[in-house]
Swiss-Prot record:
GO terms for biological process: thiamine biosynthetic process; thiamine diphosphate biosynthetic process. Substrate binds at residues 45, 194. It comes from the Bacteria. The lineage of its organism: Bacteria, Bacillati, Bacillota, Bacilli, Bacillales. Its EC number is 2.7.1.50. One of its GO terms (molecular function) is magnesium ion binding. It comes from Bacillus cereus (strain ZK / E33L). It catalyses: 5-(2-hydroxyethyl)-4-methylthiazole + ATP = 4-methyl-5-(2-phosphooxyethyl)-thiazole + ADP + H(+). Keywords: ATP-binding, Kinase, Magnesium, Metal-binding, Nucleotide-binding, Thiamine biosynthesis, Transferase. Catalyzes the phosphorylation of the hydroxyl group of 4-methyl-5-beta-hydroxyethylthiazole (THZ). This is Hydroxyethylthiazole kinase. Pfam families: HK.
């Protein structure tokens, strides 16, 4: 797997304009929709239990994000996830804040037990808590802690039979056999709320057009990181507000050639 190979997935997304169904949180809905549109995908946010199964059946991917967790949303996620499994629609799960509260952790473990996942994406603490490994977490945005990130990712991939994506200063993608580290991105991403949640949805757009889910995830992470670097180069001295706007621009303007030129991936 190399940058030339993965760069082609970006073009596929823009050619295909995949529909990505997001059951996500109230904090990030607008940013997620705008980010997907900028990339070249089509976002939809449908939460009502009366329609989620039908909406999911026509989508290219389903993204489940438990950032602002409510019982009715959990019910909708389960209905949508089961519809996705029945209709061969890949499911991506973002267990935001797993480990922060007992309820949140319970839901984060229940969803993978009920739904077959294509991708699970979170920080190290969240993924560790989903698979019941000890890792301290403070709030839904915290990922710092002690432990071997690659080991946790491989364990999650094996136990959940999925592709595990752990994001942080360096990003790790593994299907349990292949493991890839991506070293793109910029620290200013942590100053804008919703960048992690949008990332999961962007991976969803890539998964919708590339059935090798590990390859799709690596392509999405590299694209996202390069776009962040290009945006930061123009705006980091101005601050996160300017960066957020320019980042949307770069999601639209970053090309497959940029990924080949600036992508930093390593198969380990």
């Amino acid at each position: 797997m190399n940058t030339k190979e993965i760069s082609k997935v970006v073009d596929l997304v823009r050619e295909s304009n995949p529909l990505v169904h997001n059951i996500t949180n109230v904090v990030v809905t607008n940013f997620t929709a705008n980010g997907l549109l900028a990339l070249g995908a089509s976002p939809v946010m449908a939460y009502a239990k009366e329609e989620v199964a039908e909406m999911t059946s026509i989508a290219g991917a389903l993204v489940l994000n438990m950032g602002t967790l409510r019982p009715d949303e959990v019910e909708a996620m389960l209905l949508a996830g089961k519809s996705a499994n029945m209709n061969d629609v890949p499911v991506l799960f973002d267990p935001v804040g797993a480990g922060a509260t007992s309820y949140r952790t319970e839901v984060a473990r229940h969803i993978p037990a009920e739904i077959e996942l294509a991708i699970i994406r979170g920080n190290a603490a969240e993924i560790a808590n989903v698979i019941n490994e000890k890792w301290e977490i403070k709030g839904v945005d915290a990922g710092a802690g002690n432990g071997n990130v690659v080991s946790i990712a491989k364990q999650a991939a094996d136990e959940l039979n999925t592709v595990a994506v752990i994001t942080g200063k360096e990003d790790v993608v593994t299907d349990g056999e292949r493991t890839i580290v991506i070293r793109n991105g910029h620290s200013i991403l942590t100053k804008v709320t919703g960048t992690g949640c949008l990332l999961t949805s962007v991976i969803g757009a890539f998964v919708a057009v590339e059935k090798d889910y590990a390859k799709a995830a690596v392509a999405a992470l590299t694209f996202y990181g390069v776009a962040a670097e290009l945006a930061a180069a123009k705006t980091v001295e101005k601050g996160p507000g300017s960066f957020q706007i320019e980042f949307l621009n770069q999601l639209a303007n970053t090309t497959s050639s940029d990924i080949e030129k600036y992508g930093k991936i390593e198969v380990i």
